[in-house]
Curated annotation (Swiss-Prot):
The lineage of its organism: Eukaryota, Metazoa, Chordata, Craniata, Vertebrata. It holds the Pfam family Homeodomain. SUPFAM superfamilies: Homeodomain-like, lambda repressor-like DNA-binding domains. The modification Phosphoserine is found at S279. InterPro entries: HD, Homeobox_CS, Homeodomain-like_sf, Lambda_DNA-bd_dom_sf, POU, POU_dom, POU_domain_TF, TF_POU_3. CDD domains: homeodomain (cd00086). Gene3D superfamilies: Homeodomain-like, lambda repressor-like DNA-binding domains. One of its GO terms (biological process) is regulation of transcription by RNA polymerase II. This is POU domain, class 3, transcription factor 2. Coiled coil: none annotated. Predominantly expressed in the central nervous system, with strong expression in the cerebellum. PANTHER family: POU DOMAIN, POU DOMAIN, CLASS 3, TRANSCRIPTION FACTOR 2. It is found in: Nucleus. The gene is pou3f2. Belongs to the POU transcription factor family. Class-3 subfamily.
Length: 378
């Protein structure tokens, strides 16, 4: 078998030309087709009734790790080198092959004339056990037609691309299988669990309504005001809430988002208040933690009449007048000042927007004479 292959190999290498290429031509040489015709005619049918070439069996044997009969023969390598390294000598004799007949079933379609005219194709490369370019990758590959195409000497442009892609995918497939899909499943499961957990923690409107009702009942039973709760929250948790906020929470007048935020704080305050409700000073301690408000001042009727008479004379007294009036009425200076401020605000509320009430100009005594009643223009 090796002898027969060697004879055909010598016939192929003794062919006057292997490659035919002209700069302005869109067709390739016929030497490759003639050589292929020779191989197909000699090895037309095998035992499995497929017209497979003998070269394909050698390539298949090499791809499965079987040693080729020429792998250890230095003579074969010496015979191969002239065919690979001297394409120019073979191209000069291409004019003799132009008039040869071309079988219609072996017409080769080119992809364009953008390839170098030095590109060569030969089936003798199918018998080569291994050929490596400068980057050390094999140039032998098989296609459905069991031929070798696109081999350019001294460069790696003819390397089979999908074999490199397969090697690249095989190299990266463990990485993708180990670090690609399982983390995405883990992230998806963690995200799903977090989403379920957040749905369980979010109360419904019915839960908020029931909690607000229970909170108000327990707060009143413990003796705390809404202001006390707001101040206690500021002392315990750092967030001071006004009495209006607690009132709106109990009346379900806050937004759903704010109700959800305030509910756990009020729940903790209830637990804290229940744990300290046994001591007699628990209410005083929580109340003392808040703001200190001044005691409301109550003024007697006689003192209030004296202030009213002074207000009619001078609604905005000076600081010296406020001091003397406070001493005469035995009141604090701040109390007298605040009373006059409140009285002026009350007067503004009582005065209509169109102007002062009739007769108030004479009372205050600061209205100019020409601002009296105007006569209509005739």
């Amino acid at each position: 078998m090796a002898t027969t292959a060697s004879n055909h190999y010598n016939i192929l290498t003794s062919s006057p030309s292997i490659v035919h290429s002209e700069p302005g031509s869109m067709q390739q040489a016929t030497a490759y087709r003639d050589a292929q015709t020779l191989l197909q005619s000699d090895y037309s049918l095998q035992s499995n009734s497929h017209p497979l070439s003998h070269a394909h069996q050698w390539i298949t044997a090499l791809s499965h790790g079987e040693g080729g009969p020429w792998s250890s023969s230095p003579l074969g390598e010496q015979d191969i080198k002239p065919a690979v390294q001297s394409p120019r000598d073979e191209m000069h004799n291409s004019s003799n092959l132009q008039h040869q007949s071309r079988p219609p079933h072996l017409v080769h379609q080119t992809h364009g004339n953008h390839h170098d005219s030095r590109a060569w194709r030969t089936t003798t490369a199918a018998h080569i056990p291994s050929m490596a370019t400068s980057n050390g990758q094999s140039l032998i590959y098989s296609q459905p037609s069991f031929s070798v195409n696109g081999l350019i000497p001294g460069s790696g442009q003819g390397i089979h691309h999908h074999s490199m892609r397969d090697a690249h995918e095989d190299h990266h497939s463990p990485h993708l299988s180990d670090h690609g899909h399982p983390p995405s499943q883990h992230q998806h499961q963690s995200h799903q669990s977090h989403h379920d957990h957040s749905d369980e923690d979010t109360p419904t409107s019915d839960d908020l309504e029931q909690f607000a009702k229970q909170f108000k009942q327990r707060r009143i039973k413990l003796g705390f005001t809404q202001a006390d709760v707001g101040l206690a929250l500021g002392t315990l948790y750092g967030n001071v809430f006004s009495q209006t906020t607690i009132c709106r929470f109990e009346a379900l007048q806050l937004s759903f988002k704010n109700m959800c935020k305030l509910k756990p704080l009020l729940n903790k305050w209830l637990e804290e208040a229940d744990s300290t409700s046994g001591s007699p000073t628990s209410l005083d301690k929580i109340a003392a933690q808040g703001r200190k408000r001044k005691k409301r001042t109550s003024i007697e009727v006689s003192v209030k009449g004296a202030l009213e008479s002074h207000f009619l004379k001078c609604p905005k007294p000076a600081a010296s007048e406020i001091t003397s009036l406070a001493d005469s009425l035995q009141l604090e200076k701040e109390v007298v000042r605040v009373w006059f401020c409140n009285r002026r605000q009350k007067e503004k509320r009582m005065t209509p927007p169109g102007g002062p009430l009739p007769g108030t100009e004479d009372v205050y005594g600061d209205t100019p004479p020409h601002h009296g009643v105007q006569t209509p223009v005739q």
